[in-house]
């Protein structure tokens, strides 16, 4: 599969099954097969989670940042295998060493940098970092597992 960068949201949807309101990636900006992927998400006050988290102090839920990191990891795995295959999915399988270092608020641009650490028997282990303005917001080790459904 010839990968043309950047990969925009409409084409990300051809790679991973997530859709609004759960698609958390806006663009893929860098990709090296079986090694690294960089993606971005523009955080907007118009996203539904900000109605309740929190109305007077909107903060992006950490669990959604982790989900976005997992989507970036799955996208790295899928692109590294030449694209999405019918009925094949990468599921979030685990997380270790998660650290939340700063809040993410509307107007921020999250930059996700993911690196494949190991891949064995359909399970990938990734180092994932989410940054805002060059500062680490969240970091974690994420596992994704390939399944045919």
Swiss-Prot record:
Note the CDD domains from the entry: FabZ (cd01288)
Question: What is this enzyme's EC?
Answer: 4.2.1.59
Q: Where in the cell is it found?
A: Cytoplasm
- Name a biological process GO annotation: fatty acid biosynthetic process
Chief place where the protein resides: cytoplasm
- Family membership, please give it: Belongs to the thioester dehydratase family. FabZ subfamily.
Instruction: Write down the NCBIfam families for this protein, in alphabetical order.
Output: fabZ, PRK00006.1
What is the name listed in the Swiss-Prot or TrEMBL entry for this protein? 3-hydroxyacyl-[acyl-carrier-protein] dehydratase FabZ
Q: Which species is this UniProt entry from?
A: Neisseria meningitidis serogroup C / serotype 2a (strain ATCC 700532 / DSM 15464 / FAM18)
